[in-house]
């Protein structure tokens, strides 16, 4: 059960809560620039951007939960159980122009045009290795086929959706039964289920909430007092379900303010993430 968020002052911050009851061996992992990777369908990527994030390293391969590259493009995968649907590899080149290639975003790396088969676990490396921005990631996503190829027998395919962001824009990527969808994300947060459009629609239920104190409109002539700070946000969900965490994170992140210094910004960003953290045993 996870929640991801972005935050921007004079700098850009990308982070997430990874709330599990037990660890999966994840650790801070740095992938140096141009460290060679072999993809199941795309061959070897010899040139790519450096990145840092949380990963479980298996067979010298970083299985990233989340990461950000040297250009400031961040990406996080969150559980999307019951909704994520990946495709079989699209083999053959019958529909491609013979010899047609397109150059990837990282200098010197070429990828074939039209359809790129990329295993689900390879997606962070595929995008963060080549793309300097969300705009560039959209280009690769427009021709990608995320496949249901497992890393190995020990690590089966994970059901995920992803938030991808730079300092200018944020998107959500969901592979579901009717295909791959890329959504603009104006609230800069993501949780788990339900699918992103439903999460966004549910925000309509909370349109009256505010960080300001509420006006008394209960009954004409009846004097009522706002006896505590924060009463403008009464009704903001506080349970640990993913739908409620999405609403709470969107509200807190969207109304948070801090100074522009690094210390102030980092502190406030951790406060945002702490607002939706989960305590062991509570769910």
Say what each PLM segment does.
Residues 1-13, 27, 49, 149-151, ...:
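C-terminus-biased signal that marks the final domain/tail of proteins
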Residues 1-115, 148:
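A contiguous strand-loop segment
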Residues 60, 119-120, 156:
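Short, glycine/acidic-rich beta->alpha junctions
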Residues 134, 138-174:
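Aromatic- and glycine-enriched pocket-lining scaffold segments that form the walls
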Residues 77, 93-102, 106-147, 240-279:
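Alpha/propeptide regions of enzymes that mature by internal proteolysis
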Residues 170-179, 184-186:
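Aromatic/basic-lined ligand-recognition segments
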Residues 80, 176-178, 252-254:
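Histidine- and/or cysteine-centered catalytic micro-motif in compact active-site loops
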Residues 18, 79, 166-168, 177:
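Short, flexible loop/turn elements at secondary-structure junctions
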């Amino acid at each position: 059960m996870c929640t991801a968020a972005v935050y921007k002052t004079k700098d850009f911050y990308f982070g997430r809560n990874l709330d599990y009851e037990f660890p999966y061996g994840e650790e801070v992992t740095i992938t140096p620039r141009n460290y060679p990777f072999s993809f199941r369908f795309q061959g070897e990527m010899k040139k790519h951007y450096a990145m840092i994030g949380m990963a479980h390293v298996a067979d010298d391969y970083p299985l990233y939960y989340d990461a950000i590259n040297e250009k400031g493009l961040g990406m996080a995968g969150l559980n999307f159980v019951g909704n994520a649907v990946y495709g079989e590899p699209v083999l053959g080149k019958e529909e491609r122009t013979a010899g047609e290639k397109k150059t990837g975003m990282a200098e010197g790396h070429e990828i074939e045009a039209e359809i790129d088969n990329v295993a689900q676990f390879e997606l962070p490396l595929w995008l963060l290795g080549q793309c300097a921005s969300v705009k560039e990631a959209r280009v690769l996503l427009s021709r990608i086929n995320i496949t249901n190829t497992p890393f190995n027998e020990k690590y089966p395919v994970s059901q995920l959706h992803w938030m991808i962001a730079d300092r200018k824009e944020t998107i959500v990527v969901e592979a579901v039964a009717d295909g791959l969808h890329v959504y603009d994300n104006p609230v800069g947060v993501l949780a788990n289920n339900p699918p992103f459009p439903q999460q966004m629609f549910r925000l309509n239920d909370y349109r009256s909430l505010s960080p300001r104190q509420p006006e008394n409109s209960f009954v004409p002539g009846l004097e009522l007092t706002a006896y505590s700070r924060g009463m403008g946000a009464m009704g903001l969900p506080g349970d640990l379900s993913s739908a409620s965490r999405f609403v709470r994170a969107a509200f807190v992140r969207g109304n948070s303010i801090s100074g522009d210094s690094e210390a102030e910004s980092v502190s406030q960003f951790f406060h945002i993430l702490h607002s939706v953290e989960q305590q062991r045993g509570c769910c």
